C-alpha cells in the first residue's frame, strides 16, 4: 500500500493505492483534509497532524509519498507550506513509515506522460487509470495529485524493492 499526499496549508489531498502487480494498481481510499483559513496556523498544523494520524492509525501504508517543496515567489508561503509538510512527515515517521518525495513534474510524467501536464489532465488520467470518476470534480485536484504521487512511487524501483511486483 502506498499513500500519496499533496500537502497544502488549507487543503491537503491524500490517496492510498494497492499495488497487486507492478502495473496493476487499485484505489484503496482517498480524501482531503480541509482546514479553515480562520484558524491560526498552529491550529491548522495541529488539525492536519491529528487528521492524518487518524488515517494512518486505520491504514498502515508501506510508504508515504509527498510532493517536494518548491521555491515559492512568496518566502512566507514556502515556510508555511514547509511547516505543514513537516507535520505530515512527522505523522508518518512516528509510525516508522518511510517517506519519499517526488517533484510535481515527475509525478505528472508518471501519470500523464508529460511533466507540464495541467491539473485537469492529471485528474483525467488518474480517473481512467483507477476508474474513479469522482476525481474529475473540481474540488478533487489535490486528491488527484496525491494519487499521481502514489502511482509515481509504485512505478519506481524503490517500491518494487519492497517485494511488490
UniProtKB/Swiss-Prot annotation:
One of its GO terms (molecular function) is DNA binding. Its cofactor is Mg(2+). InterPro entries: RNaseH-like_sf (IPR012337), RNaseH_sf (IPR036397), X-over_junc_endoDNase_Mg_BS (IPR020563), X-over_junc_endoDNase_RuvC (IPR002176). Gene3D superfamilies: Ribonuclease H-like superfamily/Ribonuclease H. Binds 2 Mg(2+) ion per subunit. Mg(2+) 1 binds at residues 6, 142. The keyword DNA-binding applies. Its EC number is 3.1.21.10. GO terms for cellular component: cytoplasm; Holliday junction resolvase complex. GO terms for biological process: DNA recombination; DNA repair. It comes from the Bacteria. The keyword Cytoplasm applies. It is found in: Cytoplasm. The active site is at 6, 67, 142. Homodimer which binds Holliday junction (HJ) DNA. The HJ becomes 2-fold symmetrical on binding to RuvC with unstacked arms; it has a different conformation from HJ DNA in complex with RuvA. In the full resolvosome a probable DNA-RuvA(4)-RuvB(12)-RuvC(2) complex forms which resolves the HJ. Belongs to the RuvC family. PANTHER family: CROSSOVER JUNCTION ENDODEOXYRIBONUCLEASE RUVC. The RuvA-RuvB-RuvC complex processes Holliday junction (HJ) DNA during genetic recombination and DNA repair. Endonuclease that resolves HJ intermediates. Cleaves cruciform DNA by making single-stranded nicks across the HJ at symmetrical positions within the homologous arms, yielding a 5'-phosphate and a 3'-hydroxyl group; requires a central core of homology in the junction. The consensus cleavage sequence is 5'-(A/T)TT(C/G)-3'. Cleavage occurs on the 3'-side of the TT dinucleotide at the point of strand exchange. This is Crossover junction endodeoxyribonuclease RuvC. It comes from Chlamydia abortus (strain DSM 27085 / S26/3). The lineage of its organism: Bacteria, Pseudomonadati, Chlamydiota, Chlamydiia, Chlamydiales.
